[in-house]
């Protein structure tokens, strides 16, 4: 019963991670954030692998899923520090998230709750991708939205890591017990002796 509840809980956590990652992937696509897009794609693949490992009793899949979650927590911690400019991180210094391919930063920058976007006239030779706008009236600035999204990812990843370790441990214990029982039976098994119903009688040679 405990194993079943652990498996069901882990599948539920993986489904929440999958939904959160897909939602995040959509907005990163809209904002041309190529580095998060690649990371989200890998995360979605590994989460699906974790679901398959849970349903099909594959402890190795869950171990790989747990290792990835540790990397996923580190990546999201970096995103939080990047957008909140913690330490030496600065979002205005290097366009890391889009590999410096455009001036886009985050979809939430111009589409956040309550944001009013006002176009600013730029140089006549400026490219369309480098348009200038002013954003005012936002109820929550986009760095905080991105940080909250990463915090949610970390929260789900921590729960997934704990349950993945627990379920994989249960799976490995069961595999060891099955191996032990199988080896014990193989040594203790003896083939039944076939009994013959023929009666042997002595032969007498005539004198």
From Swiss-Prot:
Membrane topology per record: Multi-pass membrane protein
Membrane-traversing stretches: 2-22, 35-55, 62-82, 147-167
Pfam families reported in the protein's UniProt record: NKAIN
Annotated GO CC locations: plasma membrane
Chain positions carrying an annotated carbohydrate: 100
Broad class of the protein's primary localization: membrane
Localization of this protein: Cell membrane
Name the record gives this protein: Sodium/potassium-transporting ATPase subunit beta-1-interacting protein 1
Family: Belongs to the NKAIN family.
Keyword Transmembrane helix: yes
Subunit and partners: Interacts with atp1b1 C-terminus.
Keyword field: Cell membrane, Glycoprotein, Membrane, Transmembrane, Transmembrane helix
Leader peptide range in chain numbering: none
One BP annotation, GO: regulation of sodium ion transport
């Amino acid at each position: 019963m405990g194993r079943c509840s652990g498996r069901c809980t882990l599948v539920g956590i993986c489904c929440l991670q999958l939904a959160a990652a897909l939602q995040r992937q959509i907005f990163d696509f809209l904002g041309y954030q190529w580095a998060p897009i690649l990371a989200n794609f890998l995360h979605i693949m590994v989460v699906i692998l974790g679901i398959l490992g849970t349903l099909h009793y594959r402890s190795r899949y869950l171990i790989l899923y747990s290792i990835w979650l540790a990397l996923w927590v580190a990546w999201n911690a970096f995103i939080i520090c990047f957008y909140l400019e913690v330490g030496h991180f600065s979002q205005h210094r290097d366009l890391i998230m889009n590999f410096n391919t455009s001036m886009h930063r985050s979809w939430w920058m111009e589409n956040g709750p309550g944001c009013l976007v006002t176009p600013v006239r730029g140089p006549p030779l400026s490219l369309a991708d480098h348009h200038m706008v002013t954003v005012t009236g936002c109820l929550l600035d986009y760095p905080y939205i991105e940080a909250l999204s990463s915090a949610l990812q970390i929260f789900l990843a921590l729960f997934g890591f704990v349950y993945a370790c627990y379920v994989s441990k249960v799976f490995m214990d069961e595999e060891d017990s099955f191996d032990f029982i199988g080896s014990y039976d193989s040594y203790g098994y003896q083939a039944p002796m076939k009994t013959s119903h023929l009666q042997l009688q002595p032969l007498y040679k005539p004198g």
